Amino acid sequence: MNTDGLSREKVSDSQITSEQILQDAFQLKDEPLNRPKQSIQDLDELRSFQLTKRKEYEQQLNKNRLNFGQWLRYAKWEVKHNHDFPRARSIFERALEVNVQHIPFWTHYIQFELSHKNITHARNLLDRAVTTLPRVDKLWFLYVQTEETLKNYQMVRIIFERWLSWNPNPSAWDAYINYEKRYDEYDNAREIYIRYVQIHSSGEIWLKWIDFEMNDVPIDPEQVKRIRNVFELSVDSMLASEALRGDISLAEIINKWSLWEISVKEYERARAIFQLMLKSDTIQEIITPEQRNQIYSSYTEFEKSYGDKDTIESSIMIKRKLKYEEEVNKSPSDYDSWWSYISILQQEDNNEVTRETFERAIKVIPTDAFKSTVWRRYIYIWVKYAFWEEFTMGSIENGRNIWNKALKVIPHKRFTFAKIWISFAQFEIRNDPENGLASARKILGRSIGQSSTVKPKRKLFKFYIELEQKLGEWDRVRKLYEKWLELSLVGENNLSTINSLLTYIDFEKNIQEHQRCISLFELGVRLAEDDKIFTKVNPLEYMLMQFINYYKEEMRYAEARSLYRKLVERVSTPKVWISFALFESSIPTDSQLKAFEESTEEEFEFSIDETHRETTRSVFREANDFFKHNNLKEDRAVVIEAWKQYEEANGSEESLRDITKKLPVIVKRRRLIEGEEEEYLDYIFPEDEEAKPSKISGLNAFLANAQKWMANQN
C-alpha cells in the first residue's frame, strides 16, 4: 500500500487556495447602503424636504463659496424639483457676486435661460455680461449667435458694432465679415474690411480682403476694378508703413496680384508690377532681401511662361542688379561688386541713383596701409566716377571736384596712383583750351612733389616728359630728367637711377645731342663705380655695355674698345671676355671703313676677314691666359668652348684642330672638407700638362697605355 500517496491527498484537502480566498471575500463583502425611500404625503412634508435640501446646499456653499459646481447643482435642483425660477436666478446671482469674472458660470446661466426659452431674460443677461466683461470674446460670440438664431439680423449688426468699438482681436472682425458673407451682404463686408485694415494693419488681413474680393464676390467688370484697387491699395499701404515694409506677405500679395492679372489676360500689367517692384530704387530701399528674392523668383517663373527674349534678358539684368546690391550691402568693401552694380545702373540711365551709388562706394575707404589690390580697385571706382560725370553727364565741374577728392583720399606719403594724376592732367587739357596746359603742369608737378618721398614714380615722369616732348619744350624735358635722376639717387632702389639715365640718354640721342649723350654715359659710369651709391648690386657692367653699344652705333670703335678694356679690368667674367672677343669680329676694320668712305653706295656689306679672326683670337688668348694665371679652371673652360664655337663658324680646319687640343678633360677627384671626403670635378688642360716635361701626367700615362693596348690587339 502506498502511504505517501495517501498523505499527499490528506494534505491537499486541508490547504487553502487563492480561488477560495477570492470567493470568500466576494461572498462576505459589504452590501451597498440602501437609503430608505422617502415618500412625501402632504405639503408640510414637502416643505420640510425642501428646507432640508436647501440647508444641505447652503452648508456646502458655506464651506466653499468658490465651488461653482455646487452653485450650479443648487440652481438646477430648484428648477427641476421645485420649478422655482426666481429662486434659481437668485442662486445664479449670488454665485456671480462671489466671482463675476467666472466665464463658465456666465455661459451656464445664459444657457439655463435659453434652455427654458426665457428669451428676454437671456438677452438681458447677455447684454449685462458683455457690458461687465467686454474683453471676453466668448460672451460676444454667444450674444451674436443667440440673436442670429432668433433671426434678429439688425440686432446682430448692432452687437458687432458694439464689440468692434472695444478694438477686439481679429477673430471678431472675421466673425462680423463672415456673418455678412453668409447673407451675401458684400458691400457691408467691404466696408468692414476698410475699417479692419486700418485697425489691424498687416499683410495677412490684406490677403483676407483680397481673397474675399477674388473668391466670394461674383465677377463682373466693376468687380475687376475693385479687385485691382484692393491690390494697389494693399501694396501702397504696406510700402508706406514702416511696420509693414518687412512683412513677408508683401511678396505673396505681389505674386497673387500678377497671377490674377494673368487670369484676366493682362500680361503687360503683370510684367509692369514685377518690374516696378524690382527696378524702383525707392522700393528697393524699403523691402527686405527676403522679399526681393521671393518677388524675383515669381518674376522669373512669369517670364519663363509668358516672356520673350528681351523681357527674359531684362529679368536676368534685374537678377544681377539684386545680387550685386545684396553683396555690397553685406560687404561694403567688395569693390568688384560695386563696379558691376554701378555698370548696371549706368545702363538703366537712372542718373541720380547712379550718382548716389558712386558716393556710397567711394565712402568705403580701404584700411590697408600698403598699395594692395583692394586699393587699386577702389581707385578705379573714382576713375569711373569722374569719367561718367565728364563724358556721360557732361558736368566738367563735377568731374574736376571728383579728381580733387580722389587725390585727397590717397595717402601719398606711403604710396600713390599715377593713374589718378595722369587722368586728372588729361582732363584739364581736354576741357580747358586756355589754361588746361598750365593746370596740367601744376598737377603733374604736384604729383612729383607729393609722391616722390620714397622713390620717384616712373609713370608720372614718363608721362610728363612725353607731354613736354610733344610740345617741343626740350629745356623742360631736361629739367624733368635731372629731377628724376636726383630723386632716384635719394631713393633706396638705385637701379632706377641707371634706368632713368638711359631714358635720358635716349632722349638726347633722338635729338642728335651726341656730346650730351657721352657726358651722361660718363656720369652713369662714375655713379656705377661709386660703391657708396650702389650698395646692393653693381650696375657697372650693364652701364659700360650700354656705353659700348652707343659708341658702336656711332662707329666710334676705338672708344668702344677702350671701354671694353676698362670693363674686363673691373668685371673679369667669361661673359665679358667672350663679348669683347666677338666684338672684334663685329666691327669693320680700318681698311673696310676707308673703302666705305670712298664708296658712293649708301649700304655697306660687312664680312669677316683674317684681320677680324686674328684680333678675336688675340682676345681669346688673353682671356685664356688671364684665367690660367688666376687658376679659374671652370671660367677658362667656358672661354675655350666659346673660342671653339667661334672657330667652327669662322675659322679653318687647322685653327679648329688647334683649339680642340686646348679643350680640357673633366675628371672626378676626391678631397677632404672639414674631415669629410667629397667628390668634385676637375679640369685638366693638355697645354698645361705639356709644359711639365719632367713628370708624366696622368693623362699622358693613360694615353700611352691606351696606345699599347691597341697595338697588342692588332
UniProtKB/Swiss-Prot annotation:
- HAT repeat boundaries on the chain: 48-80, 83-115, 117-149, 151-182, 184-215, 265-305, 315-347, 349-384, 394-430, 435-470, 472-510, 555-586
Record-level Gene Ontology MF annotations = chromatin binding; DNA replication origin binding
From what organism does this protein derive? Answer: Debaryomyces hansenii (strain ATCC 36239 / CBS 767 / BCRC 21394 / JCM 1990 / NBRC 0083 / IGC 2968) (Yeast)
Which GO terms fall under biological process for this protein?
A: cis assembly of pre-catalytic spliceosome; DNA replication initiation
Q: Belongs to which family? A: Belongs to the crooked-neck family.
UniProt gene name: CLF1
Give a short account of what the protein does: Involved in pre-mRNA splicing and cell cycle progression. Required for the spliceosome assembly and initiation of the DNA replication.
Q: List the subcellular locations.
A: Nucleus
| Domain of life the protein comes from | Eukaryota
Assembly notes: Associated with the spliceosome.
Is Nucleus one of the keywords? yes
Q: What is this protein called?
A: Pre-mRNA-splicing factor CLF1
InterPro entries the record matches: HAT (IPR003107), HAT_Syf1-like_N (IPR055433), Syf1-like (IPR045075), TPR-like_helical_dom_sf (IPR011990)
Taxonomy-wise, where does this protein's organism fall, top ranks first? Eukaryota, Fungi, Dikarya, Ascomycota, Saccharomycotina
Which key words tag this protein in UniProt?
A: mRNA processing, mRNA splicing, Nucleus, Repeat, Spliceosome
Gene Ontology cellular component? chromatin; precatalytic spliceosome; Prp19 complex; U2-type catalytic step 1 spliceosome; U2-type catalytic step 2 spliceosome; U2-type post-mRNA release spliceosomal complex; U2-type prespliceosome
